[in-house]
Swiss-Prot record:
This enzyme's EC code(s): 6.1.1.15
Enzyme class: ligase
Lineage, broadest ranks: Bacteria, Bacillati, Bacillota, Clostridia, Thermoanaerobacterales
Gene Ontology molecular-function annotations: aminoacyl-tRNA deacylase activity; ATP binding; catalytic activity, acting on a protein; proline-tRNA ligase activity; transferase activity
One CC-aspect GO term: cytosol
Native species: Carboxydothermus hydrogenoformans (strain ATCC BAA-161 / DSM 6008 / Z-2901)
GO biological process: prolyl-tRNA aminoacylation
UniProt keyword terms in alphabetical order: Aminoacyl-tRNA synthetase, ATP-binding, Cytoplasm, Ligase, Nucleotide-binding, Protein biosynthesis
Primary location group: cytoplasm
Name under which the protein is recorded: Proline--tRNA ligase
NCBIfam families, sorted: PRK09194.1 (NF006625), proS_fam_II (TIGR00409)
Length: 569
């Protein structure tokens, strides 16, 4: 491939709209262009990277017995109505009508349509297990698309679905996919962690997220530094070893005026108490009712854990108006004493024996609150808070460590969540009808490309891992006007091409500095410079993009030398 003929519109400056480094560099280096908010065109360089990622995925899925198919993007509403997700999924679901006024959606995920396929085709236990996957575009109407390919409205995903006779079979399929995902991201040259996670809108029981570690990541990865322990979870799922801490001694409950005192910090200062003695209350709207979540003042409520305890379809923070209507006071003055709605309190709350909490009257708080004495007997105690860095690991007790990560894949044990709702059954050896047990497994292909850039870059541009780089080697003649340099550049270009390398030659009529900057910007792992030294001494200077090291090879050493270098990159 010749850069003089290659469609690679690079930019000299960072685009103003780009917020994260992958967005900036993929735009600058000519990989992507914005077509609409959250919608991008993948230019030739990006397409080469995406094809490599997809090829790695296909090889690992096929290795585990996966069979590739292609499901429709356009999905009929009836299937989503069967599972109840047509209304639950929310405004992120792209909905449309055809000319006959029939409802459809653009698939953000494909559980319904693949379950429909399997329920119509699979009848017997002899046809199971089954692993079916696809790689194609998905659609999600994000309210605020941002961060380039990280959160778009159109994106490429691989999703595989497993169909088994029972949970033992599902466990085998799940472990196969866990292994396959580990292989995929390892082969892509990425540093990552598999972490326990919450199932979210897809549902199911056990689930793991695969997180590429990067300082710019939106997600927080919580893990134990002891490799022998191996505990890791995302922040929403993470737990800590619970050790009760008794705070205060029982006292009489009293109502005290706290004018214009609303936050935990303000209450602590006004009443001269520690934050952990204060009880923080948060009102949520859950489906058709309300629930009050209570944690210590030095902790934060974990909305995902609350939702799982309530077992509702939709959980959202109550508005200030709803807080006043339900509890009769403003935020900052609400609390769990004397309320007639469900209360879920964190496990630590029970051990605060002399607590401060809102009095459900604006401008007043209660002191001397004892949960065992003053809360409703119906209060539910559960782990509903976010863990903090340094707290003990729930498995081994060592201090938990936080890191930032980018979710690039997730695997779920769906069990019979969809098969029962949609009537996907099979007949076992005894002729008895049983639900097919399912799992689903997704990889964000475009997100993986962006995450690779977030993890692998410097001030000069992208540093692609060799396995997913658009090209492995770029040949740069210093002067297009020097016939001998051009001749030797062409010779080495053809040599590498014939040896099976993915190589490009920069034959553009540009200054050497421009060529070198572009090579660094687009992130090709190895750059061969053909200059005066090449002509005079017959040697080729090879620069390693990742380390900036330079090595010198004779022509006859070049093929083996480059192969060895690429193995390390």
């Amino acid at each position: 491939m010749r850069l003089s003929q290659y469609f690679m519109p690079t930019l000299r400056e960072n685009p103003a709209e780009a917020e994260v480094i992958s967005h900036k560099l993929l735009l600058r280096a000519g990989f992507i262009r914005k077509s609409a908010s959250g919608v991008y065109t993948y230019l030739p360089l990006a397409q080469r990277v995406l094809k490599k990622i997809m090829q790695i995925i296909r090889e690992e899925m096929d290795r585990q017995g996966g069979q590739e198919l292609m499901l429709p993007i356009l999905q009929p509403a009836e299937l989503w109505l069967e599972t109840g997700r047509w209304h639950v999924y929310g405004p992120e679901l792209f909905k449309l009508k055809d000319r006959h006024n029939r409802d459809f959606c653009l698939g953000p995920t494909h559980e319904e349509i693949i379950t429909d396929l399997v329920r119509r085709e699979v009848r017997s236990y002899k046809e199971l297990p089954l692993l079916l996957y696809q790689i194609q575009n998905k659609y999600r109407d994000e309210k605020r698309p941002r961060f380039g390919l990280m959160r778009g409205r159109e994106f490429i995903m691989k999703d595989l679905y497993s169909f088994d006779r029972d949970e033992e079979g599902l466990e085998i399929s799940y472990r196969k996919m866990y292994e396959a995902y580990t292989n995929v991201f390892t082969r892509c040259g990425l540093k990552f962690r598999a972490v326990e996670a919450d199932a979210g809108a897809i549902g199911g029981s056990t689930t793991h997220e695969f997180m590429v570690l990067a300082n710019s990541g939106e997600a927080v990865v919580v893990y134990c530094p002891d490799d022998n322990c191996g505990y890791a979870a995302n922040l929403e799922k993470a737990e800590t070893k619970f050790t009760p801490e008794v705070i205060g001694t029982p006292a009489e409950i009293q109502k005290v005026a706290t004018p214009n005192v609303k936050t935990v910090d303000e209450v602590a200062e006004f009443l001269k108490v520690e934050k952990k003695q204060i009880l923080k209350s948060v009102l949520f709207k859950a489906d058709d009712g309300y629930v009050l979540a209570v944690v210590r003042g030095d902790r934060e409520v974990n909305e995902v854990k609350v939702k799982n305890q309530v077992d509702c379809l939709v959980l959202e923070l109550a508005s200030p108006q709803e807080v006043e209507e339900v509890l009769g006071a403003e935020y900052g003055s609400i609390g769990p004493v004397g309320v007639n709605i469900p209360v879920i309190a964190d496990l630590e709350v029970k051990h605060v024996l002399n607590a401060v909490t809102g009095a459900n009257e604006t401008g007043y708080h209660l002191t001397g609150v004892n949960p065992e004495r003053d809360f409703s007997p119906a209060v539910k105690y559960a782990d509903i808070r976010l863990v903090e860095e340094g707290e003990p690991c729930p498995k081994c007790g060592k201090a938990l460590v936080f890191a930032r990560g980018i979710e690039v894949g997730q695997i779920f044990k769906l069990k019979d969540k969809y098969s029962r709702k949609m009537g996907a059954f099979y007949l076992d050896e005894n002729g008895q009808q049983k639900p097919i047990i399912m799992g689903c497994y997704g990889i964000g292909v475009t997100r993986t490309m962006a995450a690779a850039v977030e993890q692998n870059h410097d001030e000069d541009g992208i540093i692609w891992p060799a396995a997913i780089a658009p090209f492995e080697v770029i040949v740069v003649p210093v002067s297009n006007k020097d016939e001998q340099q051009m001749k030797m550049a062409e010779e080495v270009y053809n040599l590498l091409l014939n040896a099976g390398f993915e190589v490009v030659i920069d034959d553009r009529d540009e200054r050497p500095g421009v060529k070198f900057k572009d090579a660094d910007l687009i992130g090709i792992p190895l750059r061969i410079t053909v200059g005066k030294r090449t002509v005079s001494e017959g040697v080729y200077e090879v620069k390693i993009r990742r380390t900036r090291e330079e090595k010198v090879f004779q022509k006859e050493e070049l093929v083996d030398g480059l192969r060895q270098l690429l193995k390390t990159l």
